[in-house]
A protein has these predicted regions:
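Intrinsic structural disorder
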Residues: 1, 142-143, 236
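Conserved ATP-binding subdomain of kinase catalytic cores across diverse folds
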Residues: 1-113
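Short C-terminal domain-edge/linker segments immediately following a structured domain
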Residues: 64-68, 119-121, 209-215
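ATP-dependent phospho-/nucleotidyl transfer catalytic cores
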Residues: 90-151
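Conserved kinase catalytic-core segment
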Residues: 124-193
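C-terminal catalytic region of ATP-dependent kinase domains
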Residues: 174-236
């Protein structure tokens, strides 16, 4: 989701930590579904398409511990107006809680953890720090493989919203496990306010940024794969 991020940085090296919070969401307890208003007229479609592709045309759900949140597009009356909404199944059980990477890093490295990242001189070392810090704090196995999968997914769809509150784990009485892959709403360069449909999409590829490190997608994916191996396979 393109939007008003709060970006903290040192020497022009940044980690994005928060999402814009202006999308209205509702939870239907009877149906166990989440509804999110499509403020940009593209997020719902992007989430539904990315969910469908991951579940049916990649090996994502066959990877150890990996699952994919199920999204689809619907309409609903919102404040008296008919609106397009993104609908998703609730993947969090009552006995579980969703814990973001932002929270984990603050608790493990301190509130000034961004300085730890900015002391690293290469993106490869920052990725290693992210994996090691989250792995040590949660004792979750295969943290490197999980985060590499997320980076590969974002590169596949050009998803530009994988900030540290869109990287999350689920914690229950047994410990931590990967959160289903979710929130790919800022994918496919569909935000026409930023990417005019009158211009060839390839012209925008160099401008697209991979979060949370605000780099090009290949600059994040290749070091992650070198450290933890290639994860995602596309079968189209």
């Amino acid at each position: 989701m393109a939007g008003n991020y709060l970006t903290l940085h040192t020497n022009d090296r940044a980690v994005v930590t928060t999402s814009r919070g202006n999308q209205e969401k509702w939870f239907d307890t009877e149906k166990n579904l989440w509804y999110k208003a499509d403020g940009g007229c593209f997020e719902a479609l992007a989430e539904a398409v990315s969910s469908e592709v991951l579940r049916n045309f990649t090996n994502a759900v066959q990877l150890p511990g990996i699952s994919v949140a199920n999204y689809w597009v619907d309409t609903a009356e919102v404040h008296g107006l008919k609106r397009v909404v993104s609908v998703s199944e609730n993947f969090k059980r009552e006995d579980g809680s969703l814990v973001t990477a932002n929270t984990i890093l603050k608790n493990s490295l301190g509130t000034d953890y961004l300085e730890e990242f900015n002391r690293r001189t290469s993106l490869k070392e920052r990725i290693r720090l992210l994996v090691d810090a989250m792995g040590e704090a949660t004792r979750m196995q295969n943290m490197g493989a999980y985060l590499t999968t997320l980076f590969e997914v974002d590169a596949l769809f050009l998803n530009q919203d994988r900030h540290l509150n869109n990287i999350a784990l689920i914690r229950d009485k047994f410990g931590y496990k990967p959160c289903p892959i979710f929130d790919c709403g800022d994918s496919f360069l569909l935000d026409f306010a930023l990417y005019s449909p009158e211009i060839e999409s390839r012209a925008y590829l160099t401008k697209a940024q991979c979060l949370p490190f605000k780099s090009r997608f290949t600059q994040t994916v290749h070091p992650a794969q070198a450290l933890y191996g290639k994860q995602l396979v596309v079968n189209i």
